[in-house]
Swiss-Prot record:
The gene is potA. It holds the Pfam family ABC_tran. This is Spermidine/putrescine import ATP-binding protein PotA. ATP binds at G40, P41, S42, G43, C44, G45, K46, T47. Belongs to the ABC transporter superfamily. Spermidine/putrescine importer (TC 3.A.1.11.1) family. It comes from Mycoplasmoides gallisepticum (strain R(low / passage 15 / clone 2)).
Length: 501
């Protein structure tokens, strides 16, 4: 795999008209030929991020770079992407073969035996366009700098009022939502002290928001101007490429021949396992087969990147597993960049070279699957990515941790932790070994067992009444006192969140 940055997202933000921030100052590098998964719960911003890449949504601000060039102003059909959707989006009146051929009929390839002077002319057109673009970008850079300074001055006005600073992103929709919530609480309040408190909060909300409105209006106006200037910067960055491409399409490229279309379509149909289904209509196919058609239609036009928007979520477990294996195989064979959106942790862990864990519009952690699973950066990621036992403890130094139960355990990691730091400790259920009483690092009482088909899920109680879950091959009797062992490498420390300290 090429270790070369291909796609860069820089300070990408998407705020909708109602004030909802779907993606917040997102920064991400994606390498050429990498299989990257955007993983997170519903509403975390992963699908919005994919739409921003594809061009179906425009960022409020920020840069989306391909090979160093900001493409956020580039039309959808000009971007080096193809998208596979969750609902397949097949043409119901076309056969499998015609669905796959659809993009090939407008695809262009280089002409053979062209005059070399035409290629030189194309480069000259690009160079002239680059000169023009450079001058425009320079002017826009000065304008953006002035606008950024204006925004900084307006931000300082928010800082004069603690309420405004805390609620700087609040606009009318959020204000109404907060007001309705407080009024609903007031209508249900009985005690006079609570009624007085809520009335005071409502008065403060109304007063502070009225003071904030003129500042918001000035801020939003300048921000809009900055976004517009940023959009034009993106336009001029892609301008030389577009000018060259326009010339090449007229004199240096051609449409595919009927024979070439047939050959490419048949090869792709074979690659995705649709041989024999060419004359079927989508309505005659299972969900899994329809998704294969959607995959073939996207890949046949030879995109540099394939965007996958939860393509397997509507399929049953068996078919989903089969298609996961197919995706992995196809990615390996084609060696192009795949970007997958999913909420399925197992899917992300099994398919990805890199996982991007998202929550509430922010990136929580980026890393290889094993790093995300074994060394999550915080408790939220640890619990989201898989079953997790989280203990409170104190780092004693010398790779030793004292749990709140009083038990002292070893770890093989230290990172930035110092002696005396309060920590969260992660041990996955599968990392425990059940042994005889007093033969482990500490004893626990078995309070519940459940057979999961391959392993027993054993729920235990520690001496400080902390509940933990253990995966075990053999059944353990409820009420038994057993010992638990684990390897030092399976003990992962996380910093305590500020509100927990």
């Amino acid at each position: 795999m090429e270790d070369k940055v291909f796609i860069q997202l820089r300070n990408v933000n998407k705020t909708f008209d109602d004030g909802f921030v779907a993606v917040r100052n997102l920064n991400l590098d994606i390498n050429k030929s990498e299989f990257v998964t955007l993983l997170g719960p519903s509403g975390c911003g992963k699908t919005t991020t994919l739409k921003l890449l594809a061009g179906f949504e425009q960022p409020t601000y920020g840069q989306i770079k391909i090979n160093g060039i900001d493409i956020k102003d580039m039309p959808v059909h000009k971007r080096p992407f193809a998208t596979v959707f969750q609902d397949y989006a097949l043409f119901p009146n076309m056969t499998v073969y015609n669905n796959v051929c659809y993009g090939l009929k407008i695809m262009r390839v280089p002409k053979e035996n062209t005059d070399p002077k035409l290629a030189v002319e194309a480069e000259n057109i690009k160079k002239e366009a680059e000169k023009k673009a450079a001058a425009k970008i320079k002017d826009l850079s000065r304008k953006k700098n002035d606008l950024s300074n204006k925004l900084d001055k307006i931000r300082k006005e928010y800082e004069k009022n603690d309420w405004m600073l805390e609620n700087d992103e609040m606009r009318f929709a959020q204000y109404q939502e907060e007001l309705i919530k407080l009024e609903a609480q007031l209508s249900e309040a009985y005690e006079q002290s609570e009624i007085n408190k809520l009335n005071q909060e409502i008065v403060e909300l109304k007063t502070n928001y009225q003071k904030k409105i003129p500042i918001d209006n000035r801020y939003d106006k300048v921000l809009k101007e900055l976004e517009n200037a940023d959009g034009w910067t993106s336009y001029w960055e892609t301008y030389p490429i577009m000018k060259k491409e326009h010339f090449e399409n007229k004199v240096l490229t051609r449409r595919l021949t009927k024979k070439e279309i047939e050959e490419r379509a048949n090869n792709m149909i074979k690659l995705v396992g649709l041989t024999g289904k060419e004359d079927k209509y989508p309505s005659e196919l299972s969900g899994g087969m329809q998704q294969r058609v959607a995959l073939a239609r996207a890949l046949v036009i030879e995109p540099e990147t394939l965007l996958l928007d939860e393509p397997l979520s509507a399929l049953d477990a068996k078919v989903r597993k089969q298609l996961q294996n197919e995706l992995k195989r196809i990615h390996k064979e084609l060696n192009i960049t795949f970007i997958l959106v999913t909420h399925d942790q197992e899917e992300a862990l099994s398919l990805s070279d890199k996982i991007v864990v998202m929550s509430q519009g922010d990136i929580e952690q980026v890393g290889k699957p094993n790093a995300i699973y074994d060394s999550p950066i915080n408790e939220w990621t640890a619990k989201f990515i898989g079953a997790a036992n989280i203990f409170d403890g104190k780092y004693l130094g010398d790779y030793k941790i004292e749990l709140n139960s009083g038990d002292i355990i070893d770890t093989d990691e230290e990172y930035e932790f110092k002696k005396g730091d309060n920590v969260r400790v992660l041990i996955r259920p599968e990392d425990f070994d059940v042994v005889e009483k007093d033969q482990g690092f500490f004893n626990v009482e078995v309070i519940k067992t459940s057979y999961k088909g391959v392993l027993w899920e054993v729920e235990c109680l520690m001496s400080d009444k902390t509940k933990i879950k253990v995966d075990n091959i053999d059944e353990v009797k409820v009420g038994a006192i057993v010992g638990l062992k684990f390897d030092e490498m399976d003990v992962h420390m996380m910093r305590k969140e500020e509100e927990d300290v």
